[in-house]
Amino acid sequence: MPKKTVANLTEADLAGKRVLVRVDFNVPMDKATGAISDDTRIRAALPTIEDLIKKGAKVILCSHMGRPDGQVKENLRLTPVAKRLSELLGQEVIMCPDCIGEGVTAAISQMSNGQVALLENLRFHGEEEANDPDFAKKLAANADLYVNDAFGTAHRAHASTEGVTHYLSPSVAGYLIEKELNYLQAAIETPQRPLAAIIGGSKVSSKIGVIETLLEKCDKLLIGGGMIFTFYKARGLSVGKSLVEEDKLELAKSLEAKAKEKGVEFLLPTDVVLADKFDKDAESQIVKVENIPDGWMGLDIGPESVKVFQEALSNCKSVLWNGPMGVFEFDKFAAGTDAIAHTLADLTATGTTTIIGGGDSVAAVEKVGVAEKMSHISTGGGASLELLEGKVLPGIAALDEA
């Protein structure tokens, strides 16, 4: 069901109103300097924040950072985020002493229309992740309505994503969540065809649900990353010291059989880059998958596989990518992932819809420097996967229907 969004709210709805906005400001911090090392998530929230400012709302932002487990941790305070956000907005952002309590109420009561305040880290209170109703009520007490723009936590029923919606009306989606839903749901429900899905990562177990769902939806399924060795072993091939999930061999067989039955083109790499140890400076060699020697482990897909994958993708109108092709953190084993990133960037330029489905593949396209060239980069890891699996996300379900 489509959800009501910020776009549905007029200046008359918002002027002078206190709007609680759940954002995802869980940004990476440089441990040595305490500075923000990547402000992508802060920038991603700007369209919603700027729209609310323009419409005269009093904007109260709330987010978590890290895993403080209900304790106040000085290194997880949101003060650096408030500073960076004020630079991006070109106006002061009031930093609140907590996320609930008298100090917060006092700070918000002083706000003028168009001002922005940031509450302190929600997870300094254990009640946030427990979705405690009293905590949710206190959080909602300083606001008139609610906007959720934190897609990365939409798959969690927390006080700030689900609990507060019981006390604030309307409760609507922000622009970032709206964009995520538009792209990800369209990708699996009404895609331009052929639709290819590229699934990577080290373990089959973490991607079972998404592979099973995609086998019902896509025309081509390309598998890369460490999980390929479980498929090879299931076929009876020797995989040396490569990562294998022994308890998933039957599942790998059944997924491959299901692809055949559904008429989905199922592609595994034909060659791999091997290493003698898991190390960035390991000895390496490229071999056909039938010739993996004992004592070696596969850490990337090989150049022949890249060509096969590129050929398979060349006529696709929609491509969804989740998970790297190899250990891209080691330059020696990043070629497969880099090549797929460049291939998708080139396809986007010719009109193909390319969606990077959260997690490590986002880091990969950013590392290669082609993030801007993709149609859509999802800000959610687990949330993206669950949405692609067809699961209901509590943070989305709790919002008002359009």
Swiss-Prot record:
Positions annotated to bind substrate: 24-26, 41, 64-67, 123, 156
Pathway: Carbohydrate degradation; glycolysis; pyruvate from D-glyceraldehyde 3-phosphate: step 2/5
GO molecular function, one term: ATP binding
Annotated ATP binding sites: 207, 298, 329, 358-361
Gene Ontology terms describing biological process: gluconeogenesis; glycolytic process
Keyword Ion transport: no
Primary location: cytoplasm
Keyword NAD: no
Record localization: Cytoplasm
Catalytic activity entry: (2R)-3-phosphoglycerate + ATP = (2R)-3-phospho-glyceroyl phosphate + ADP
Keywords, comma-separated and alphabetical: ATP-binding, Cytoplasm, Glycolysis, Kinase, Nucleotide-binding, Transferase
Entry GO CC: cytosol
First-level EC class: transferase
Enzyme Commission designation: 2.7.2.3
Family: Belongs to the phosphoglycerate kinase family.
Subunit description: Monomer.
Protein name: Phosphoglycerate kinase
Protein's organism: Microcystis aeruginosa (strain NIES-843 / IAM M-2473)
Organism lineage: Bacteria, Bacillati, Cyanobacteriota, Cyanophyceae, Oscillatoriophycideae
Gene label: pgk
